[in-house]
A protein has these predicted regions:
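C-terminal EAL-domain catalytic cores of bacterial cyclic di-GMP phosphodiesterases
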Residues: 330-336
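Catalytic cores of alpha/beta
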Residues: 350
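Acidic/polar, low-complexity intrinsically disordered N-terminal segments immediately downstream
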Residues: 1-146
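Chitinase-like catalytic core of GlcNAc-active glycosidases
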Residues: 118-133, 145-324, 338-345
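Conserved small/polar residues in nucleotide/adenosyl-binding loops
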Residues: 363-370
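Cysteine-clustered segments with highest specificity for TGF-beta superfamily mature ligands
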Residues: 358-362
């Protein structure tokens, strides 16, 4: 059974009421369409029959007082709401007493309601986008309607050095760029199903590398990655330390180290929080300088443990990830399963990892082609 959710709202006057004052709270279904149009959202109207407003919605402020409260009760059952759908409860305050005006910014109270998934472990999948369309992730649905995959990682964008412009930048091959340019058609359907979409970043055979940027370089590149997430509506960045020569010099670069890898993760998370009005992840694949031993980052003498700016970690093929400092096993993948090599995991093994406290499983390189194992 689903317990009813009760919310208490307070209506406050700017001045003390000289006489009894009444305001009515009404359910205004039309407001949801208006809100969606203005904010480019896709909220669904919460069923009005499941919303009860005390006292028929009338808020009465006695003479001599400045405020009064009213209780709103939401009573959905498990079958009333769909997974991966966000519902809006659109409540409008309408003045009932002559001479009282409700300010525009206080006219609507919008509750957002979502059905909490029953899954106890997250499934994260790396898609080799040169071979496979990430939209295939939508095809894997559990019996109760939840998507099997919780996050898709696009493999991959690159960290590269532009010698002509003397800067480090994110380089996307034609397949990656096509996904970004066509985000509304090829990536946003995943997000609308509740599947996060991350862009993986790895080296590309030159001096630029994830673990070799100066503090200033980390800040600049982190801001670029955050801007990419904002522009293309992505849910975060993955880091994979491979294929870098680490031979750069100048203000962009520092000697490669786990300290600089941690700094890039910190700056990327910080920039995403500042730019993106949605939850974002920093996800790590343990290779090279990116390991569970990543150190803390100190900014103006304040320590920031890796768990503050890293959300999920995974090991290389077949391994279980150890947590970074401050993180529990809930942020770790208990196994990394390479699907295109025919690797798999039994439900018993997955449950055992879940019972040990691991919070996710990693899958790589699914293939929908005929004859492929996935």
């Amino acid at each position: 059974a689903v317990e009813p959710v009760k919310k208490t709202l307070t209506f406050t006057l700017e001045k003390t009421a000289t006489a009894e004052t009444k305001v009515k709270l009404v359910f205004d279904e039309r407001h949801v369409d208006e809100y969606n149009f203005d904010h480019a959202t896709e909220y669904v109207v919460f069923p009005e029959k499941l919303c009860t407003i005390a006292n028929d919605g009338v808020i009465t402020i006695p003479a001599g007082e400045t405020s009064a409260q009213i209780e709103v009760t939401l009573s959905p059952s498990a079958s009333d709401l769909e997974y991966v759908t966000t519902y809006m409860v659109p409540l409008q305050a309408v003045a009932q007493t002559e001479g009282i005006v409700v300010k525009d910014e206080a006219e609507y109270v919008d509750f957002l309601v979502s059905r909490i998934g029953s899954k106890k472990i997250r499934n994260i999948c790396y898609f080799e986008v040169n071979d496979c369309n990430p939209l295939n992730a939508i095809e894997y649905i559990l019996e109760d309607g939840q998507p099997f995959f919780d996050a898709v990682v696009l493999f991959a964008g690159n960290i590269n050095w532009d010698a002509s412009k003397q800067k480090v930048y994110m380089n996307a091959n034609p397949n990656v760029q096509a996904l970004l340019d066509n985000s509304e058609e090829l990536l946003q359907p995943l997000r609308k199903k509740g599947i996060k979409v991350l862009l993986d970043i790895l080296g590309n055979h030159d001096q630029a590398g994830i673990a070799g940027l100066s503090d200033w370089g980390c800040e600049q590149f982190g801001k670029e990655l955050a801007q990419i997430c904002l522009d293309y509506k992505l849910d975060g960045i993955g880091f994979d330390d491979e294929y870098s020569s680490y031979s750069g010099s100048g203000k962009w670069f520092a000697g490669p180290s786990s300290q600089q890898a941690a700094r890039l993760c910190y700056e990327t998370k910080k920039a995403m929080k500042e730019l993106c009005p949605w939850e974002t992840w920093v996800h790590l694949y343990y290779l090279g300088y990116i390991q569970s031993s990543l150190p803390s980052v100190f900014i103006d003498g304040v320590e920031h443990k890796p768990s503050e700016f890293i959300d999920n970690v995974c090991a290389d093929y077949g391994g279980a990830a150890r947590p970074v400092n401050g993180m529990g096993l809930s942020g770790c993948a208990g196994n990394s399963i390479q699907l295109n090599y025919g690797n798999s995991i039994s439900s018993e093994s997955a449950k055992a990892l879940m019972n040990q406290g691991y919070g996710c499983l990693l899958y790589t390189s699914p293939s929908p082609r005929d004859g492929a194992t996935s």
